[in-house]
Amino acid sequence: MKSLVRVAVTGAAGQIGYSLLFRIAAGEMFGKDRPVILQMLELPDEKAQAALKGVMMELEDCAFPLLAGMVGTDNPDIAFKDADVALLVGSRPRGPGMERKDLLMENAKIFTAQGAALNKVARRDVKVLVVGNPANTNAYIAMKSAPDLNPKHFTAMLRLDHNRALSQLSTKLSKPVANIEKLIVWGNHSPTMYPDYRFATADGTPIIEAINDQAWNANSFIPTVSKRGAAIIEVRGLSSAASAANAAIDHMRDWLLGSNGKWITMGVPSDGSYGIPEGMIFGFPVTTTNGEYSIVKDLPIDTFSKTYIDKTLAELEEERASIAHLLR
């Protein structure tokens, strides 16, 4: 058995948390030879804590061989103590009549506090994935609130968008998703994201040879991927939970265990590549090895792509400006 890993999960009793925890405990995130301790954070109110207790009872009842221990708490200092990995799932959802800027402000308070708690008690090499929306800006806030931790280890989840785009291409081409490589989702985890298959291949053949159809790209593919979350809410009555949890597992597994040379999409702090301001958390194509990621460099950006990348960048710059005063 490998050494155990301490995993902090916020919003642990929520829909995504419930879909996520059992799969982590079963070994799907870190491998079938890595014991885990789950350190679960929920809101301090009675209902949330009772729900968390119920989740912990169910985890006990699964008798997972890899589950070496559990902590359930409303205290971030306890949940993040010595954490190797932190999955920041919980965030304030957008309520009726709430403006986007109000949502940003409410979440800025949460992620400032969580970043500070990570800075105080987590392992110095902790790897952080922000799932709670607006994920890119929440990750930026947490990163800026944890000055003693490695900023490169604060990431946002764009893997759900990546997986959604993979699925759409798979359907269009009648090819298995496993045979499609070099897909990218640029930018913000929001409807402005830009799924880009210009470099993608299916069975080693460039996809643009099979789908040389800019009208389908602009009018069907991009809108379907970018509005998929809203489409699921419309029919399910609830937001994506199982698919989001699955994407979180994919993101962390590939980051920690390696992508084997394959491109994946991660929201990571920019190093200035592709003209994206340094430090901004932005969706890039990356490869991963030995627990570290590298941005895929020097891909040509055509006029069509630049329009979309500029739009998602502008949105992120606006979000960052709206919360800048909270980070001074």
Curated annotation (Swiss-Prot):
Give the E.C. number(s): 1.1.1.37
Read off the Gene3D superfamilies from this record.
Lactate dehydrogenase/glycoside hydrolase, family 4, C-terminal, NAD(P)-binding Rossmann-like Domain
**Cytoplasm among keywords:** no
Keywords attached to this Swiss-Prot or TrEMBL record, sorted alphabetically, are:
NAD, Oxidoreductase, Tricarboxylic acid cycle
- The UniProt entry annotates the active site at H189 (proton acceptor)
Reaction it catalyzes:
(S)-malate + NAD(+) = oxaloacetate + NADH + H(+)
* Chain sites annotated for binding NAD(+): G11, A12, A13, G14, Q15, I16, G17, N107, Q114, V131, G132, N133
Would you tell me the protein name for this molecule? Malate dehydrogenase
- Stored CDD domains: MDH_chloroplast-like
Please give the biological process terms from Gene Ontology that the record holds. malate metabolic process; tricarboxylic acid cycle
Give the disulfide map. Answer: none
Q: What does this protein do?
A: Catalyzes the reversible oxidation of malate to oxaloacetate.
Membrane-spanning regions, if any? Answer: none
Binding positions for substrate per the UniProt entry: R94, R100, N133, R164
Q: Name one Pfam family in it.
A: Ldh_1_C
What GO MF terms are annotated? L-malate dehydrogenase (NAD+) activity
**Family to which the UniProt record says this protein belongs:** Belongs to the LDH/MDH superfamily. MDH type 2 family.
